Regions:
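Divalent metal-coordination and catalytic microenvironments
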Residues: 35, 52, 62, 77, ...
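Binuclear metal-ion centers of metallo-dependent hydrolases, dominated by the metallo-beta-lactamase
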Residues: 235-256
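Metallo-beta-lactamase
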Residues: 23-26, 30-32, 57-59, 65-66, 118-241
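Conserved beta-strand hairpin/beta-sheet module of binuclear metal-dependent hydrolase folds
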Residues: 30-75, 176-190
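Active-site metal-binding motif and surrounding structural segment of the metallo-beta-lactamase
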Residues: 55-57, 67-112, 217-220
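Bacterial N-terminal signal peptides that target proteins for export
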Residues: 1-9
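Hydrophobic h-region of N-terminal signal peptides that target proteins for export
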Residues: 11-20
């Protein structure tokens, strides 16, 4: 694993901590369309997750930052449906995607991930919690809660209404996209957002290749939900992020 913290990342975290505090940290659940809801989690560094309300149960995509944020999300879900939360997908091994595991397990949900995410959680969880605490000292020291069920690669939940897709390393080695075919929506996870964001754990050699593979799938989605900052974007977000990666690469080359 790379060095624990970078000065630019500390600066970024500090700025976002001030913004989040000013906005009164909270969980906001907003309908998108069909079965889908967008979660905006204003705690720590703002992150966006998703909720799929199926015929008989609810699937949460991204466990949010902590057991407390997970509880707040569950409360919001309870306002829109009496259906139980039965599955929670850890979309990568970082705390913003797996920190709420303990709460969800306690209410009876199964934690789901790829084998790779499960392996990385078991090896790096304590280190990742300390990493977050460098930028956010109030972040709790959470024990590892590993997934209950894992998959070797791509998987489907909710009778195919929720499709997890792994295409290669990007923001992390293990990050997945989640596609919702009926709603023509894609959850971009931490892989896609309007800013470059934290690249301390990114594979900058493979990142653009992974995004090109996503484009080549021609999934036909009309909405991308970004993992951080503003949630709602069109398919053009992929090319926008590719441009950000390319500009960073040119800047690095120019400095040599």
């Amino acid at each position: 694993m790379k060095r624990l913290i970078s000065t630019p990342f500390v600066f970024l975290l500090g700025l976002n901590a001030l913004v989040s505090a000013a906005e009164n940290p909270r969980i906001v659940l907003t309908p998108l369309r069909g079965h889908l809801y967008v979660v905006e989690d204003y705690f720590y560094l703002k992150e966006n997750s998703m909720v799929y309300v199926g015929d008989s149960s609810v699937t949460v995509i991204g466990a949010t930052w902590t057991p407390e944020t997970a509880r707040l999300l569950a409360d919001e879900i309870g306002k829109i449906t009496p259906k139980p939360i039965t599955e929670v997908i850890d979309t990568n091994y970082h705390p913003d995607r797996a920190g709420g595991n303990a709460y969800f397990r306690n209410i009876g949900a199964k934690i789901v991930s790829t084998n790779m995410t499960n392996d990385l959680l078991k090896v790096h969880w304590t280190e990742m919690v300390r990493y977050v605490q460098k930028g956010f000292p109030s972040y709790p020291t959470l024990p590892l809660v590993a997934p209950d069920k894992t998959f070797a690669g791509n998987f489907e939940l909710q009778d195919g209404g929720v499709r997890a897709i792994y295409l290669g390393p990007s923001h992390t080695p293990d990050g997945i996209f989640v596609f919702f075919p009926k709603e023509k929506a894609l959850y971009g996870n931490c892989i896609l957002k309007e800013q470059l964001g934290n690249l301390d754990f990114a594979d900058l050699t493979e990142y653009a290749k992974t995004l090109q593979k996503l484009k080549q799938l021609n999934l036909g989605f009309t909405t991308i939900v970004a993992g951080h900052w503003s949630p709602l974007h069109g398919p053009e977000l992929i090319d926008q992020y590719l441009q950000l990666l390319s500009a960073k690469d040119r800047s690095k080359s120019g400095a040599n």
